[in-house]
């Protein structure tokens, strides 16, 4: 059901997950899935959202982070559930004949309360990326809030970025 939030056509091929309620160690999820008709657009070019950056597995681990960056500054510390690291690693296999025309830019931010590192590359029918979101404090002090705000706004921006693809030979077909 979780993967179908990406697309009603998504089909899980395999999944492996640690115990999600064991907070003594990192949570690892590996999910192989196919999502036919996941791309947007018609004609030669298509737009592809980065699936795992839609944070479909983030219900228990990231939901308290979103919507916390409204004010420009804070008088009091911002309380979060916990400090944490969310590392997204994904490989997307493109259909035969597709090439990548434009990738989102890399991001490398670090500060006293949060960090964000995003790298993406394409090669021979695949797109590979890593996105490392690090929340260093469970209470973000007012002096460090600007860093937290900047990192979270950039992360939220990344969740909406797309990869532009093109079908070799000039015509994209479904």
Protein language model annotation of sequence segments:
Residues 1-174:
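A sensor for short, sequence-defined functional sites
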């Amino acid at each position: 059901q979780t993967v179908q939030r990406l697309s009603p056509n998504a089909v899980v091929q395999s999944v492996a997950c640690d115990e999600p309620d064991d907070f003594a160690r990192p949570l690892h999820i590996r999910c192989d899935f196919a999502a036919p008709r996941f791309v947007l657009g018609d004609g030669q070019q298509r737009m592809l959202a980065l699936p795992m950056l839609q944070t479909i597995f983030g219900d228990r681990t990231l939901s308290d982070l979103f919507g916390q960056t409204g004010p420009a500054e804070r008088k009091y510390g911002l309380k979060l559930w916990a400090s944490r690291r969310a590392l997204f690693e994904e490989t997307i296999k493109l259909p035969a004949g597709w090439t990548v025309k434009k990738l989102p830019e890399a991001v490398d931010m670090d500060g006293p309360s949060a960090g964000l590192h995003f790298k993406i590359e394409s090669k021979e029918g695949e797109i590979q990326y890593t996105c490392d979101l690090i929340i260093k404090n469970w209470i973000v002090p007012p002096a460090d809030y600007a860093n937290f705000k900047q990192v979270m706004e950039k992360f939220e921006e990344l969740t909406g970025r797309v990869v532009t693809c093109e079908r070799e030979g000039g015509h994209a077909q479904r």
